């Protein structure tokens, strides 16, 4: 419950930031109304298009049971065990080792893994990764993360447009009488940074829960712990290149564990995640599967 409240508060802060940007840049009640409308449209768009956006960003390709029988049957088996509809299965054409889930609810969900992760993880570790992604679907984290990514992207886009306007003289002084000059400057400089920090904080609140859900679903926390360690090392060697706004969807990232790394990381430190999994191992009954 604590993580859910924190996530809701962070999402509200992100939408509030989008509204504030419009207010400061456009000025007055018009800016406020436009900001509220933009936030509403962005969130509604994310609700219906979140899966399509994420899959397109990573160029994920759908696969059938005949094309990837081992992966397909693993997703099917774990979905049955979790008592959720089987999500669509995708493969990302990249040697970077990673995975993600997307979709607004379990009935409209998808799980995607890279070619790289299929090549390097043994079955028990891959099972832990798939179970982690299915837990995101069960918890509706996939929608939360997609909305956060889309709103953060809208904030960055708006700030970039304002920046271009300032540099290239778009609009006269009379056209912008309602705008607050200091607000415009602060928007261009700080809004994308603030949006990124909030978005990444949202992601970090969900990862421990997904790890724990994976451990309970497979009965094998240690396998996921090994997978996370292996994936972190490989992610630094072969990163999965895409829009940074969608990095929180991935199971692992490659940002260092220093203070600034933690602040701008979409995930908790891998060491902390591994420690939590090994602690959970002591609390779980003997693996039944």
Swiss-Prot record:
TM annotation in the entry: 7-26, 31-48, 151-171, 182-202
Membrane association type: Multi-pass membrane protein
Organism from which the protein derives: Nostoc punctiforme (strain ATCC 29133 / PCC 73102)
Keywords from the named record: Cell inner membrane, Cell membrane, Hydrolase, Membrane, Metal-binding, Metalloprotease, Protease, Transmembrane, Transmembrane helix, Zinc
GO BP terms in the entry: proteolysis
Cofactor(s) it depends on: Zn(2+)
Family: Belongs to the peptidase M48B family.
CDD domains in the record: M48B_HtpX_like
Protein name in the entry: Protease HtpX homolog
Localization terms from the record: Cell inner membrane
Enzyme class: hydrolase
Taxon lineage: Bacteria, Bacillati, Cyanobacteriota, Cyanophyceae, Nostocales
